[in-house]
Amino acid sequence: NEENNFILSKSGLVIKYNYLNKIKEYKINYDEIETYLKEEYKMDDIVIPVLTPTKRNLNKYKNKKLIALTFDDGPSNNTKYFIKELQKRDALVTFFVVGNRVKKYEDVLKEAYLMGNQIGSHTYSHKNLLYLNEEEITKEIEKTNEAIYNVIGTKPTIIRVPYGNINKKIRSISNMNHILWNVDTLDWKYKNSNRVYKEIIKHAEDGNIILLHDIFKTSVNGVLKAIDELKKQGYEFVTIDEMVYLKNIKLDKSKTYFNFK
């Protein structure tokens, strides 16, 4: 049984479905269906996304060595290719997206989410929250959450603040779970796929959270090579939510998480 997902907007009804592990879609123009809609579903410019992501059977990952690969600053032109390659490898990751990039890449964000990848917040414009007042911090977080909601139909529950700069005030204002990292590949600095590969292999340990950026093609290439190697060593690649579930951890919004060891 394939699960159907639909997005209803003023432009029409788009039905997305998984067929032979590929996301297909069928579109009906709004003016063709408006007569048949209940009043509460008729709209002007309101978008109501209803998406159901693929859920893996996590039982097969119990007692496995788990790594959470996390990607900041996207989505980007590399993301579509990347998620398709991840799918071939039965690997899922977490994307901490920048809110002001969501609209431009909404199609790939939907596809990533439908495949089972997790979407988190990286704030709206990547400002250092330590230097913002309460109103500005709130705006950075809420605008991102709304942007993500308008695309996938649910708000993120996890956030990674820019530069990893976090304090008690930011945690309190956000009311979200804060995920940082314990392995920084410095992929943004060197932009070298072989170095990315070596850093991931070098720091591969159960429970690690690895920081990367899918805006760089070198990062994408290095990651895919590392996944292929580490799969041979018995590692599995999971989202933050999957990691938390498999390790039976209850997240606390008053804490900041660097790994799940």
What are these regions (language model features)?
Residues 70, 120, 160, 211-212:
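Generic enzyme active-site microenvironment
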Residues 1-67, 81, 89:
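Compositionally biased intrinsically disordered regions enriched in Thr/Gly
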Residues 223-224, 249-254:
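Histidine/acidic-residue-rich catalytic or RNA/ligand-binding cores of hydrolases
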Residues 20-23, 73-77, 100-103, 119, ...:
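Solvent-exposed loop/turn segments at secondary-structure junctions
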